[in-house]
Amino acid sequence: MAHSKTRTNDGKITYPPGVKEISDKISKEEMVRRLKMVVKTFMDMDQDSEEEKELYLNLALHLASDFFLKHPDKDVRLLVACCLADIFRIYAPEAPYTSPDKLKDIFMFITRQLKGLEDTKSPQFNRYFYLLENIAWVKSYNICFELEDSNEIFTQLYRTLFSVINNGHNQKVHMHMVDLMSSIICEGDTVSQELLDTVLVNLVPAHKNLNKQAYDLAKALLKRTAQAIEPYITNFFNQVLMLGKTSISDLSEHVFDLILELYNIDSHLLLSVLPQLEFKLKSNDNEERLQVVKLLAKMFGAKDSELASQNKPLWQCYLGRFNDIHVPIRLECVKFASHCLMNHPDLAKDLTEYLKVRSHDPEEAIRHDVIVSIVTAAKKDILLVNDHLLNFVRERTLDKRWRVRKEAMMGLAQIYKKYALQSAAGKDAAKQICWVKDKLLHIYYQNSIDDRLLVERIFAQYMVPHNLETTERMKCLYYLYATLDLNAVKALNEMWKCQNLLRHQVKDLLDLIKQPKTDASVKAIFSKVMVITRNLPDPGKAQDFMKKFTQVLEDDEKIRKQLEALVSPTCSCKQAEGCVREITKKLGNPKQPTNPFLEMIKFLLERIAPVHIDTESISALIKQVNKSIDGTADDEDEGVPTDQAIRAGLELLKVLSFTHPISFHSAETFESLLACLKMDDEKVAEAALQIFKNTGSKIEEDFPHIRSALLPVLHHKSKKGPPRQAKYAIHCIHAIFSSKETQFAQIFEPLHKSLDPSNLEHLITPLVTIGHIALLAPDQFAAPLKSLVATFIVKDLLMNDRLPGKKTTKLWVPDEEVSPETMVKIQAIKMMVRWLLGMKNNHSKSGTSTLRLLTTILHSDGDLTEQGKISKPDMSRLRLAAGSAIVKLAQEPCYHEIITLEQYQLCALAINDECYQVRQVFAQKLHKGLSRLRLPLEYMAICALCAKDPVKERRAHARQCLVKNITVRREYLKQHAAVSEKLLSLLPEYVVPYTIHLLAHDPDYVKVQDIEQLKDVKECLWFVLEILMAKNENNSHAFIRKMVENIKQTKDAQGPDDTKMNEKLYTVCDVAMNIIMSKSTTYSLESPKDPVLPARFFTQPDKNFSNTKNYLPPEMKSFFTPGKPKTANVLGAVNKPLSSAGKQSQTKSSRMETVSNASSSSNPSSPGRIKGRLDSTEMDHSENEDYTMSSPLPGKKSDKREDSDLVRSELEKPRSRKKASVTDPEEKLGMDDLSKLVQEQKPKGSQRGRKRGHAASESEEQQWPEEKRHKEELLGNEDEQNSPPKKGKRGRPPKPLGGTSKEEPVVKTSKKGNKKKPAPPVVDEDEEEERQMGNTEQKSKSKQQRTSKRAQQRAESPETSAVESTQSTPQKGRGRPSKTPSPSQPKKNIRVGRSKQVATKENDSSEEMDVLQASSPVSDDTTQEGAEEEDISAGNVRRRSSKRERR
C-alpha cells in the first residue's frame, strides 16, 4: 500500500493510506470517516512496528493537538481518544508526548471520554468499551506517576469511573475498571487523601444506596489493593480518630460507617484501626461513644463476624458499655444483643450477665428492649437462648411498667405457642419452656386490670387458640389443665369465674335497658355500668364509653339483639365470633384511624364472648376424658399419666359446671358422668357428683332416664359412700329432685336408726349425711334431730371417751393416725354446727348450749371429759374443731349475738394454740369468714394475737389476712356509699376498740405495769395499727386517736367494777396512744366524726370524768420510736423491676433502681429491735417460700421471690445498725453448722411448762432443705416434739445465746410451689370446711419430703411421706388457763435485731407483695390444696426449732 508522499522528518504529517488530511476545513461527517480509518490503522499496529511508529509519529502528535482535544463533536473526541489510547500502547513505554502539560491534557481528555461508558445502549458503546479496555490493559495512566498533577488526573479518573458504572454494565466493564484503578494504587508511590476519598465515599451509606454498582466497584478495588492501600487507610483513621483532624477529609464525619464497610470488605484493612476503637469506647464524649458502640454492634453482630474471638480485649471493652452511664448507649447495646444471639450463639454466655443487669435497668425502654432482644432470638430458635435469658423475660412479667410487662408476656406467649403447642423444635424444647404456661396464668393474680385482660387474650390466642377446631381445642385445653401447677389452675378457674360474672353483669344491664325508663331504672343502669367499668382498663374513660355504649344499646335494637345472643348461656363459640364481628363492624362506622370507644368495647366483648366453651365443646371434652378412661387417649405422649389426666379432666369439667352449666345439658354428657360416678377413684366420683349438683336442675324434666339411673347411685353414696361423696350426694338430691323431702326421709330414717356408738368406723358417713340433711331441710326433721343431738351426739359421742389414746408427746399426727373415736367426735361437732346453721334460730336455746359445750372443749384443751384418756394429737384436733365451729356459728347473726365475750376471748386464743397446725387452719377459717364479710369486725382483732406467733410465716400470713380484709372493707364502703348504717361493722378502723379490749383480757397480760408484758401488748397493737395507719385517709389517724381517748372515758363492760381490769384497759389504751403519737404527725387534728364504741365491750362514757392519767411506767417511753408507718398497699411498689422480695440490697450500680430506704425506726420498738418480726413489709419469703398455703393474698409475692436469684444471710446483733453481710450458699451452710454447735452446748430444759416460750429460731427456720434432711437423718430416732419445752412467755422468741441471732440462709424451694395459692373461684363453702381439717394430715405428711430436689413434684399427692415430720412444735398452751399456774417468769428483754440494710430491703419487697396480694382476683375460699403446701413446709421449720430449744 502506497503512502502519501510526505516525509516524516520534515514535520509533515503522514496519514494512513486512503486517508486525506484531517483539518478544520472538512465537514464533521468526513472527519469522522477519516478518523475511523486512522483508528483502524492504530488498532492494527503493535509495539514492534518500529518503521510505522516513526512514520506516524507526527500524526500521533497532531491528534494530541488542542483542535482535537477540544473538538465540540463527541464522536470526533471519542475516535481521537481511541487513537491516543492505541498510541500509548504502541509507543509504550515511552509516550511520544514529552510535555507534562500535554500529557495531563491528554489523560484528562481520555478521562472525559470515559464518561461515554454511562450509556450502554449508545451505538458508540463498544468504542467506549474499547477505549477502557485499552487503557486498562496497557496501564496507560501509570505514565502520570511522574507528573506533578498526577493526583488530579487519578482523582478525576476515579470519580469518572465511579460515576459512570451502572447496572447496565457487564462483568468485563467492571473488571477493566478495577484493573485500571488498582494498577494506579498498587504501582504508585503514594495514595493521596483526595484519591482515597474518591474510593471511600462510595462506601458511605448515602452513596451506597444511590449507586450500588459504584459501591461494588469500590469494594472490589479495596479487596484487590488491600495490602497497598491499608497504610493510607490507617493513616486516615489515625488522623481523624486519634488526632481529631477532621478537616483532612470531607469523609471524617462518616468515619464509623466507613470502618464498618471496610471491615465487611476485608478485616485486614483495619488491623491497626481496631485498637483505636477501644480507646474511643472510653471517650468522654457521649455521642462519640454512642457512634462507636453502634459501629461495633454491627461488626460484632454480623453473621460471619469473628471479631469477638479475634479481638477479645475489644469485645470485653464493648461489653463494658452495657453499663454505660448514657442511656442511648445502653439501649444500643441491648438492641445489638438479639443479632449477636442469633448470629453468634457462642457469645450468649458473655451476654447473659450483662443482659441480667440491663433487665433491671431504671430506664423502661432498656428493660423493654432486653425482652425484645431475647424473645426475637428465641422465636428464631429456642436453642439460641439459655434458661437464664428466658428467666429475665419471666422476671419482667412483673415489671412496674405496663409496656415492659406486656412485651414480656406477649413474648413468652409467642414462644409457648411456637415450641409447646406447635412443637416447632421437638419435645426437648417444649420441656425447656414448660413453665411458661404456669407463669403466664400466675400473672392473673396482678391487681392491674390490664395484666388480667392480657392474660385472657393470651389464653384465647396462644395457649388454647380459639380458632382451633372444637375437638382439637378441647384436647389442647384438657392436657393444658392436666399439666398446670396448682396456682395456675386456680388462676384459670378465677379467669372463667370473672368472665362469667361479667357476662351476667352485661346480661343484667340488657334486662335493665329493656325495662321502661324510671328514676329507679336509670339509677340501676348507672350502678350496673359502674360495676362493668371496673372490669375494663382505664376506669375513667371506660365509664364514659360504657355510658355511650348503654345509649347505643337503647337506640340500636340490632346491636342489642347481637349482645343478647352473645351473653345467652346457649351461645355457641361460632355464634359468639359472629356476634362480636357484627357489633364491632356496626360500632366501627364511620371508620376512623383511632377509635378508643371501639377499642374499649372490644375489650368488653373479648371478656364476655364464650370463645372456648359451648355444648359441643363440653361434649368433646367428655369424650376426651372417656378416651383416657378407656385407655385409648395419647396421655403418655402428652407427658401426662392417665390417672392424672382423668382427675384433671373431671376437675376441669367441675369448674366449667359452675361457669357454663347449660353447656352440660346433653344426654351423652350426663351418661358419661354417670359412668364416672361408678369409678373406683374417689376424686373422680366426687367431681362427677359436684358436676351433677351444679348442672342437674333440668335432669328431672329433660332427661328422665338419667334421673332414674342417678337416684339409686345417690342413695347408695349418701348411706355408704366416702364422707365427701355422701355430702355431695345429698346436695345433688337437693338440687335435682322435686321430691327431695321423700328422698331425704328415705335416707335419714334408716341412718338415724342404725347409728351405733360402738361401731365408730361406720359412723362418719352417716354423721356427714345427717348433718347436710339438717342443713338443707332443718324443719323436716326438727324433732328427731334435736333428740339425736342431745342424746346421741352429746351424751354418747362427745361426753364419752371409750378408748384410751396412744401415749405421745406429739401435738399433731396424720389423719390415719388419729383415733377413729376422735374423727367421729369431730364429725359430731360439725354435724351440730350444720344443724344449728340450718335452724338459724336459738328459740330452743340449742345454740347457747352448743356454744357452752364448744368453749368447754377449748377450756379443757380438747379433753372434754378431763379423764386424761385422749392423746395430745387428738386433743389438738378437737380444739381445732371447736374453735372452727365457733367461728362458723359467729357468721350467723342469731348465734353471733349469743356468743359471750368470755367465749369470744377463749376462741380467739386458738390462734395462739401450742400446735402449729391448729394455729394455721384456725387462721384460715378466720380469714375466710372475714374476707367474705360474714364474720363481725371483732373477729378481725384476733389477728393482733398473731404478733406473738413464733413462726415468721404465721405472722406473715396473719399480716396478709389483715391487709386483705382491711382492703376488702374499704373497697366495699367505697362501692356502697349508702351503707353508712353498717359503718360500725365495716369501717376497718373500728377494729381498734376490739383489739384493745381483747389485749386487755389477754391471759398473758397479768401484771399491769410489767415492761415485758407491755412490750408484747405493743407488738400486738402495732401489728394492727401499722396497716390501718399506712394511709391517713379521711384523717383516720385522728379518728383512731379519738377512739382510744374515748375508751379511756369508759369502763370495761365485762367487769365495770373490776379496778384492775379497767386499769389494764387504760394501760393498753396508753400503749396504743403512744404508738399513734410516735407514728403520726396528723393525730392531733380534729377527728372527722365522733367514734361510736361497741356497747357490748364498753360502758357509756362518763361525761363528768376526765381520765387524763398516764398508766404507762416511765421506762416504756423508750420503746416508742417515731417514724412513719410503712405503706401497706402502695400501687407504685407493685412491680419493682429491680427488687425481688427477700433479696439482699444491691448496690446502685448493679440495680440502678432506687428503693425505699425506710429506716428501722418505722416500727415502734426499742432501738435494738429492727422492724419487729413482722413489720408492715417484713414478708421474709426466705422462710415463706415453702409455705404455699392458701393465702388470702395469693399471687405475686412469691413470683417476685421466685425470680430472685440472690440469697440472704444476716448475722445481727441487738441494737446494731451494721450492714448485713451477704454470704454465698457455702458460707451459709457453714453458718448452719455453727448454729448447730452453739445449740449443742445449750443445757437441755428440765421442766415441761404448759406454755411454750421459745420460738423457732430464725436460723433453724431458714435452713436449706437438704441440710434439714441431713439433720433429720442424724436425729431420726429422736422425736423433736417430745422434748419438754422450756417455760417462757407465749410465742415470743427469747434472747438467743450471746444476745445474737442468726438469720441463716434462705430456704430455697422449687419455683413451682412457691406462689401463694388462690382459692378456686367456684368452691363449695362446706366442701372447703371439710377439707381443711381432714387434710392437715396430707399437708403435714409431705413436710419431710420437702427438699429442693423434690420440690418440683409438689403437685403430686404427698401420701407417701414419712409421718415423723408431721408433729408440730408446741408453741405453748396459749391462752387456756393453766391447771397448775406457774409463776410468771422474767423474760429476757433483748429483741433480736435485723440489720438496717435488710430491713430496708424487706420494706421494698413486701410493700410490693402486699399490694400484689391486697386485692388478689382470687377468691378467699381457702381450699385444701391451698392450705396443703404451706403446712407441708411448716412442719420442717417447726421441727427444727424444737431441736434447738431442747438443747
Curated annotation (Swiss-Prot):
Q: Which residues does the record list as N6-acetyllysine (modified residue)?
A: K1136
Q: Where are the HEAT repeats?
A: 383-419
* Gene field: Pds5b
Question: What is the organism lineage in this UniProt record?
Answer: Eukaryota, Metazoa, Chordata, Craniata, Vertebrata
Q: Where is there biased composition of kind Polar residues?
A: 1137-1155, 1358-1371
The answer, when asked if Kinase is one of the entry's keywords, is no
Report what the protein is called.
Sister chromatid cohesion protein PDS5 homolog B
The biased composition feature labelled Low complexity covers 1156-1167, 1378-1387
Which organs or tissues contain this protein?
Answer: Highly expressed in intact prostate with levels decreasing after castration. Expressed exclusively in prostate cells inhibited from proliferating by long-term androgen exposure.
Quote the biased-composition stretches of kind Acidic residues, using this chain's numbering. Answer: 1422-1432
Q: Where in the cell is it found?
A: Nucleus
Q: Which residues carry this modification: Phosphothreonine?
A: T1366, T1369, T1380
